[in-house]
Amino acid sequence: MKIYLVGGAVRDSLLNIDVKDKDWVVVGSTPQKMDSLGYQTVGQDFPVFLNPKTKEEYALARTERKSGQGYKGFTCYAEPDVTLEEDLLRRDLTINAIAQADNGELIDPYNGQQDIIDRTLRHVSDAFTEDPLRVLRVARFAARFHHLGFTVAPETMHLMKVLVDSGELSHLTAERVWQEWQKSLSSQHPEIFLSTLKECGALAIVLPELNALFGIPQPEKWHPEIDTGIHTLMVAQQAALLSQDLPTRFAAQVHDLGKGVTPESEWPSHKLHCHTGIKLIKRLCDRVRVPNDYRDLALLVCEHHSNIHRAAELRAQTFIKIFDKMDVWRKPERLAPILLCCQADHAGRLGLETQPYPQKKRFEAAFDAAKNVEVKDVVAAGFKGPEIREELSKRRIEAVKDKLNIK
């Protein structure tokens, strides 16, 4: 029985990245042997065990044979005669198929170290095409390691296209699609996840609402990049620069979905996209099972971003109406991420990335003034019932007028 450190821990140490999780592969053992050593069985689909002391995962070396459709359509063989090289062969990318022995020796039968040096994401074998989840995983790794210069090998991109054409991606569950998308949001370049899926054709299958944005024109006066899909990628990049918050990054990526259904006769204008996008975001979030906090923020950004961009033109009562709809009186923490998304939208335009966004400060100032109007003061003044809300709004409007010098 031999134990090796494998996968991401070996890869990240070679990239001088802090290793957070360690996975181990055990060669020459059995479930009975692992049980006798005190390891706890946790794997349902194949033999995986938790170390009783470290709680790290130890998996028996195994091979996989395609036996059905989708990423679960595999038959596993995990007997003691499975070699380390056979176990590494089933892995997705060469950079993830390096093992380390307890003496520090690296076992690298598929040249993963060279691909790390060359900054290349390359499949281990043609068995890559047996698992549709690997398309999303490669896109996520492309996003995660983009800042280090990694790109997808042309031959791997070809196999990703083969997988897409096979129809296998339709068997991915909503949970797995969201899991990979959500992980990509935490990378320095989440837009690369989307652009990689677009390049191989997978975006049209797993996230058709986003795919529909590519090729849709916008007014060149406001959007020198013209293409709404390109704009969306730029906004995703800007949001990642502005915020570490994942719901904020998600909302920025989907804020313009309504432009994908604008009638061609109305191009390049998209006057109703803030309205039409709401239905699309709801449908997308329901299908992919996006958490409610992500969904709620995305809907607010979609509905209000155009008005926020027009902050300099808004009347005081319009500010109050927007704040009412956002429910920021009860949930003031909502305002900051909404404004950050709008700032990312503003900056996600070709050649205008560093242009100031005074609208953000104007909205912040308006809210600071309005929130200082106290309900108790309105009640103390003798207002009752429905009069309270009406008077509260009036006082808030006056506060915004005074703060922003609106006549």
Curated annotation (Swiss-Prot):
Tell me yes or no: is Glycoprotein among this UniProt entry's keywords. no
Could you say which cofactors this protein requires?
A: Mg(2+); Ni(2+)
Q: How is the cofactor bound?
A: Magnesium is required for nucleotidyltransferase activity. Nickel for phosphatase activity.
The EC number(s) given in the record are 2.7.7.72, 3.1.3.-, 3.1.4.-
What are the GO BP annotations of this UniProt entry? RNA repair; tRNA 3'-terminal CCA addition
Q: Which CDD domains match?
A: HDc (cd00077), NT_ClassII-CCAase (cd05398)
Q: Name one Pfam family in it.
A: HD
Keywords assigned by UniProt, alphabetized: ATP-binding, Hydrolase, Magnesium, Metal-binding, Multifunctional enzyme, Nickel, Nucleotide-binding, Nucleotidyltransferase, RNA repair, RNA-binding, Transferase, tRNA processing
Q: Does the keyword tRNA processing apply?
A: yes
Q: Where does Mg(2+) bind?
A: 21, 23
Catalytic activity line of the entry: a tRNA precursor + 2 CTP + ATP = a tRNA with a 3' CCA end + 3 diphosphate; a tRNA with a 3' CCA end + 2 CTP + ATP = a tRNA with a 3' CCACCA end + 3 diphosphate
Where the record annotates domain HD, the positions are 228-329
What does the sequence similarity comment in the record state about its family?
A: Belongs to the tRNA nucleotidyltransferase/poly(A) polymerase family. Bacterial CCA-adding enzyme type 1 subfamily.
Assembly information from the UniProt record? Monomer. Can also form homodimers and oligomers.
Q: Which NCBIfam families match?
A: PRK10885.1 (NF008137)
Q: What does this protein do?
A: Catalyzes the addition and repair of the essential 3'-terminal CCA sequence in tRNAs without using a nucleic acid template. Adds these three nucleotides in the order of C, C, and A to the tRNA nucleotide-73, using CTP and ATP as substrates and producing inorganic pyrophosphate. tRNA 3'-terminal CCA addition is required both for tRNA processing and repair. Also involved in tRNA surveillance by mediating tandem CCA addition to generate a CCACCA at the 3' terminus of unstable tRNAs. While stable tRNAs receive only 3'-terminal CCA, unstable tRNAs are marked with CCACCA and rapidly degraded.
What additional remark is attached to this entry?
A single active site specifically recognizes both ATP and CTP and is responsible for their addition.
Query: What is written about domains in the entry's comments?
Result: Comprises two domains: an N-terminal domain containing the nucleotidyltransferase activity and a C-terminal HD domain associated with both phosphodiesterase and phosphatase activities.
- Write down what this protein is called: Multifunctional CCA protein
What organism does the UniProt record list as the source? Aliivibrio fischeri (strain ATCC 700601 / ES114) (Vibrio fischeri)
Which lineage?
Bacteria, Pseudomonadati, Pseudomonadota, Gammaproteobacteria, Vibrionales
